[in-house]
Amino acid sequence: MMQLLTAGGLEPLTDQVRTPDGSNPKGYFEYEPVKSLAQDQSWLPLARGKVVKVIVQLLQFLPTGLPCQVVLMQRDIDEVLESQATMLGKQLPASQAQTLKATFQRHWEQSRSRLESSPECSLLVVEHRNLLTRPETEITRLIEFFTPQQLKREEMRRVVDPTLYRSRTSGESP
């Protein structure tokens, strides 16, 4: 998503500390201070007008009253767990996977609910699978969401790479 928004013309807030690797060959687009959002929000003014990658577990620590636009990625949790296992080189025991799955789902639902009820926040939910299988539809939604900025449709279209959709729960190809 970060690559897509950047290609569209939005400026990312990133420090490039975490470099591309085999799990994410196009980069991570992370900003280290985000990891401490629960304890330190002093960096938030630097994010004004930029796109910032924030994992769902940390969204609850965005200050109340902060005007923002949030693109919330929805991805099949089994695909997330499979992707993490591949990246880490180990599978979780089934009981741990179930607990993690329930925790992740709870965080995602709580974050969505909080963002939807926040009058100063605009929210767009994008399904990961749809982005890779129907990119044109999702790109149009993103362009409409970020209006009045003029996102570059062609550049966004070019960066969608279905070959990076390696962990999927069904045998379908994107």
Outline where the language-model segments fall.
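PAPS-dependent sulfotransferase catalytic core
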Residues: M1-K50, R158-G171
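Detector for methionine-enriched segments
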Residues: M1-M2, M73, M87, M156
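Proline- and acidic/polar-enriched loop/turn elements at helix boundaries
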Residues: V17-R18, E127-H128, E154-M156
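Amphipathic alpha-helical interaction segments
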Residues: S36-L37, R112, E116, S173
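PAPS-dependent sulfotransferase catalytic domain
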Residues: G49-L151
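Residue-level marker of intrinsically disordered, low-complexity segments enriched
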Residues: L123, R157-R158
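Charge-rich, low-complexity intrinsically disordered segments
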Residues: K152, S170-P174
